[in-house]
């Protein structure tokens, strides 16, 4: 069984280091770098989810997904699409229906923030704006 840790939009894969060191499964776990999955592409939710799904589908064993914020949305989406592949979910700050107005406000604020505020995450400023814009219509409530 493989444990996959997914960070949020404002973090990076290193955000899970303390967690993986504290667990007994660190040898069979991976902290995924979401920015790397869409590197060289327009950072849309569908591009990110597609890359994430391909990576999960390539695993030869069941997976346990642990996601924070954006990572939890990806994990939830994958578990809905591939329920037999996902053994368990740990979702932190998950949204099953995106708060569209809040995402629009957040994007408006992103426009005024300097590029340097985004760099340590691996995503650029335009990536943040694009991801949030393309997530606004997500709704897993059905």
Named regions from a protein language model:
Residues 65-67, 92:
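Short beta-strand immediately N-terminal to the catalytic nucleophile in serine-hydrolase-like folds
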Residues 80, 88-116:
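Flexible "cap/lid" loop of the alpha/beta hydrolase fold
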Residues 8-11, 69:
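Active-site glycine-rich loops that stabilize anionic/oxyanionic intermediates
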């Amino acid at each position: 069984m493989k444990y996959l840790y997914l960070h949020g939009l404002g973090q990076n894969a290193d955000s899970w280091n303390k967690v993986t060191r504290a667990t007994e499964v660190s040898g069979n776990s991976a902290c995924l770098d979401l920015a790397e999955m869409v590197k060289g592409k327009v950072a849309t939710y569908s591009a990110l989810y597609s890359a994430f799904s391909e990576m999960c589908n390539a695993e030869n064993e069941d997976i346990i997904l642990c996601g924070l914020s954006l990572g939890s949305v990806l994990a939830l989406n994958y578990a809905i699409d591939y329920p037999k592949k996902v053994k368990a979910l740990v979702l932190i700050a998950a949204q099953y229906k995106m708060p569209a107005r809040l995402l629009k406000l957040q994007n408006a604020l992103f426009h005024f923030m300097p590029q340097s505020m985004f760099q340590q995450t691996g995503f650029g400023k335009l990536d943040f704006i694009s991801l949030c814009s393309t997530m606004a219509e997500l709704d897993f409530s059905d």
